[in-house]
Amino acid sequence: MVDYTQRPKSRFLRVKCNDCENEQIIFGSASRKITCVVCGRTLAEPTGGKSTITTHILEVLE
């Protein structure tokens, strides 16, 4: 049986900051610049669709 239900293509991501090792959950299609809450480093930048992730992705959350 084929599943025809529509699912969103956007996901939440667990990322780790390259500077302070802080783990944070961010939205993969964010419309604003996302910074680390501890050190202020840019983690993701918007591109009109999916965000450009500038740090290490630990896990893709469903």
UniProtKB/Swiss-Prot annotation:
Binding residues annotated for Zn(2+), in chain numbering: 17, 20, 36, 39
Cofactor(s) in the UniProt record: Zn(2+)
NCBIfam families reported in the protein's UniProt record: PRK00415.1
InterPro entries, per the entry: Ribosomal_eS27, Ribosomal_eS27_Zn-bd_dom_sf, Ribosomal_zn-bd
Official protein name in the record: Small ribosomal subunit protein eS27
Cofactor details (free text): Binds 1 zinc ion per subunit.
GO molecular function: RNA binding; structural constituent of ribosome; zinc ion binding
UniProt KW keywords: Metal-binding, Ribonucleoprotein, Ribosomal protein, Zinc, Zinc-finger
Stretches annotated zinc finger (C4-type): 17-39
PROSITE patterns assigned: RIBOSOMAL_S27E (PS01168)
Similarity comment text for this entry: Belongs to the eukaryotic ribosomal protein eS27 family.
Superkingdom of the organism of origin: Archaea
Biological process per Gene Ontology, one example term: ribosomal small subunit assembly
